[in-house]
Amino acid sequence: MKAWSAISVLILAAVAFLVMRPGRAPDSQAPTAMQAPTPEEREAAFQAEIRMENPIAPLNSVWIEELTWIEVRDAMAAGRTTAIIPTGGVEQNGPYVALGKHNYVLEGACDAIARELGNALCTPIIKLVPEGGFEPKTGHMRYPGTLTVRDETFQMMLEDVGHSLHVHGFEHIIYIGDSGGNQAGMAAAAAALNERWGEAKAHHIAGYYDNAGVVARMNELGVEEGPSDGYHDTYWLTSMQMTVDPSTVRYDERVAAGKATINGVSIAPKEETIALGEQLMEWRNNKTVELIREAIAGR
């Protein structure tokens, strides 16, 4: 059987040589190689694909990364032509609070802001931001786990994300930042994009980062913090973070260890702190919505 197998291989090879050898006259019975599509054919196929209807029900989300490209296209066609680029950070926040504090707050804030606007989507949160120097380590970089990028890296990232959205057809690009160190880079990125585009379509909403306003609102609600415990942490921000995920401030572990306070205010019971956080989030989100609408209107 092995001899016959070898002979079969030789016969097939000879036939292939005769069929494919150069200069052989075309034979309707001979196999032909598939022709690669022309550039025109590839473009026609793309145009057919880009116009395809969504074959399934769309996801109810305002987060671009959670959507399919078809869902983004259809959302834009339905009027969602404002894109929000939220910036957070990965930085030390004391012994209880996760490094991604600002990112967790933004998960709740950007979602609510986009839905209240009714015409907006959120990009993925920009989590890598300037947090201090490398060598020597400065600022939050003195603490393990903090991640930093250079100012120019941060600004270029913001510009590239904003320009990506612009070329897709988003009419207004909104920058909001949950950390103070992000504000200058966002303002610079918005200014650079507006200069490139020749029109004011990128907007840095500095008023989102109104810590004094949030504290004043908290005081109106009957809560005042005492002297600082010396950590990069506050009760008002912890309460807003807990509306998204109490485990990110180690709620259960702190209660068990008798450490459930910050700056003289107890974060227990959980339900009361979350209720306050929801009111503070609502106040800041509503203010931000107004500021975004004013920026888009040119006021």
What does each model-found stretch correspond to?
Residues 5-13:
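Sec-dependent N-terminal signal peptides
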Residues 2-6, 18-174, 178-299:
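Extended, histidine- and acidic-residue-enriched regions that form the cofactor-binding/catalytic faces
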